[in-house]
């Protein structure tokens, strides 16, 4: 997963690379690359994600990082950025050739969440079958995704990555979406991982609802006269919660104290605060609060629109 997202973010995804001797000689699962063949980096990522091609992983590492060691440096740097505090990468494919190559289920979930925000990664991860022309032969390469949850077992699965080594045993990271709720499941050393993931997803989809905690647009109930009718957030805040958890949610608004020069010059920072969402005292989301100075003409227009909307919905207004 890390190797794939770094390849995609490198800006070289459509670059053609030449497969080296060291890439062809990697042990384990393979997409059977040929030394000296020229292949697009994007095709290598498909071979990596769908067929666990260790040869593809090395070819990607050499193309993006200049060498395997150079690429491993990029992997650990990205892991630090994502917050994977219990992860150390030592190679681009995950084989048991380094003692300190290790991670956790939680860190893998953080990585998958990060990667799934990339459209190209999401598309590749969710591909069931990929076909590409073989550069050296008359026949095409056809790769079927090893993720059986995606291909046959679970209709709500949207992607993932399988894995196996002698030390880690069966490992599996998958994603699923149902009724607007996106979930990630991770298992390590789990012999019955397909059923484990389905069970976790079904349990979560049954118990959790996507709950709206704050609506995109203008913030109401702002008491400060300087900020009143001037503040907004740019996105809806929605979070999966059980009915019991919904009662433990708190929304807190923190604003910068208005400065004298703001009132004198009218020059106010774009971001003037934040909206924090807490569940049982733990921060689950934080959204910037933006300031937008409206002219009296704009305010009059928007007030009329608001009153009209209230009248159409049958609600009463103070005016």
How would you name each of these model-derived features?
Residues 99-319:
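Domain-terminus/edge residues, biased toward the C-terminal soluble/receptor-binding domains
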């Amino acid at each position: 997963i890390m190797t794939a997202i770094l390849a995609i973010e490198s800006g070289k995804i459509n670059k053609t690379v030449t497969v080296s001797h060291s890439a062809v000689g990697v042990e384990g699962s393979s997409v059977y690359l040929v030394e000296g063949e020229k292949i697009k980096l994007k095709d290598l990522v498909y071979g990596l994600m769908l067929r666990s091609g260790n040869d593809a992983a090395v070819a990607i590492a050499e193309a993006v990082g200049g060498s395997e060691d150079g690429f491993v440096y990029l992997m650990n740097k990205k892991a630090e950025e994502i917050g994977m505090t219990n992860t150390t990468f030592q190679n681009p494919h995950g084989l048991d050739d380094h003692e300190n190559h290790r991670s956790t289920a939680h860190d893998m979930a953080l990585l998958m969440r990060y990667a799934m925000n990339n459209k190209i990664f999401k598309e590749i991860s969710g591909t069931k079958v990929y076909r590409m022309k073989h550069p050296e032969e008359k026949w095409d390469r056809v790769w079927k995704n090893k993720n059986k949850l995606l291909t046959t077992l679970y209709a709500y699965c949207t992607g993932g990555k399988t894995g196996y080594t002698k030390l880690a045993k069966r490992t599996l990271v998958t994603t699923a979406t149902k009724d607007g709720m996106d979930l990630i499941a991770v298992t390590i050393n789990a012999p019955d991982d397909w059923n484990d993931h389905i069970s976790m997803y079904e349990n979560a989809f049954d118990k959790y609802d996507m709950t709206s905690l704050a609506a995109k647009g203008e913030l109401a109930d702002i008491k400060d006269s300087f900020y009143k009718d001037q503040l907004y957030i740019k996105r809806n805040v929605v979070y999966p919660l059980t009915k019991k958890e919904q009662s433990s949610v708190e929304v807190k608004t923190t604003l910068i104290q208005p400065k004298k020069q703001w009132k004198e010059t009218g020059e106010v920072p774009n971001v003037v605060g934040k909206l924090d969402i807490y569940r049982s005292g733990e921060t689950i989301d934080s959204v910037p609060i933006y300031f937008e100075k409206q002219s009296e003409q704009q305010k009059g227009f928007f007030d009329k629109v608001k009153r009209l909307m209230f009248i159409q919905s049958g609600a009463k207004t103070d005016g």
